[in-house]
């Protein structure tokens, strides 16, 4: 194995509901330009349960990043992908995991998902991961392991599903309310004027992701 492959820090990108791993293509390229090794984890967001997908992510980390590689591992998850990450972190995660960035993840609840789940035929469309998550007691707490830092990035541009699902609290990103993203125990959080899906193509988001992966904090000014 080459020396650079042993020392390179890895970022694993985890997509959200109804989307393939390819939706993180831009962020993948941007992170590679910063010197990271980038992997995109794909999973059945509709067919698989949250528990199954979290276990699959844990196995993916173990298989794709050999135990002999000591370099830090970072995770970035969009929406449901963030919930998969949080669920995986509850089960003795790899000690090399250092930082996590959650993009538009409904950490504590989801008004849109609960409203849709109550409509005929919608539970099957939302999928088993979302339904399992909704069945749990609301409220998620960040892992307590001291070496783990989690950053929460939320959007405030209300464009999307929220316009047809009544009652979504403001501010929101069109799908997830800002208040729903607030993860107790997170190292830092930031709100940007982007919509839910826009996070996947936003250079502003990319810059904040990179800053958090490097420092464990976002940059809270106008210079990003």
Region roles according to the model:
Residues 1-8:
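Short beta-strand-to-loop junctions in surface cap/lid or active-site-entrance loops
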Residues 9-22, 26, 30-147, 168, ...:
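Serine-dependent carboxylesterase/thioesterase catalytic core
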Residues 147-224:
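C-terminal catalytic-base region of ester-bond hydrolases, centering on the histidine
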């Amino acid at each position: 194995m080459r020396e650079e492959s042993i020392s390179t820090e890895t970022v694993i990108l985890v997509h959200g509901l109804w989307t393939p791993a390819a939706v993180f293509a831009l962020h993948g390229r941007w992170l590679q330009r910063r010197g990271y090794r980038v992997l995109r984890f794909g999973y059945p967001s509709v067919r698989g349960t949250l528990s199954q997908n979290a276990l699959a992510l844990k196995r993916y980390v173990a298989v794709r990043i050999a135990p002999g590689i000591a370099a830090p591992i970072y995770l970035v998850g969009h929406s449901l992908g963030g919930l998969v990450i949080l669920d995986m972190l509850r089960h003795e995660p790899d000690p090399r995991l250092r930082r996590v960035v959650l993009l538009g993840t409904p950490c504590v609840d989801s008004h849109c998902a609960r409203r849709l789940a109550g409509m005929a035929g919608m539970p099957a469309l939302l999928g088993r991961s979302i339904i399992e998550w909704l069945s749990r007691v609301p409220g998620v707490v960040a892992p307590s392991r001291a070496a783990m830092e989690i950053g929460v990035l939320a959007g405030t541009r209300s464009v999307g599903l929220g316009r047809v699902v009544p009652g979504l609290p403001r501010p929101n990103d069109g799908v997830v309310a800002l208040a729903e993203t607030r993860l107790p125990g997170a190292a830092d959080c930031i709100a940007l004027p982007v919509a839910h899906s826009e996070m996947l193509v936003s250079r502003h988001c990319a810059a904040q992701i990179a800053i958090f992966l490097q420092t464990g904090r976002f940059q809270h000014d106008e210079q990003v």
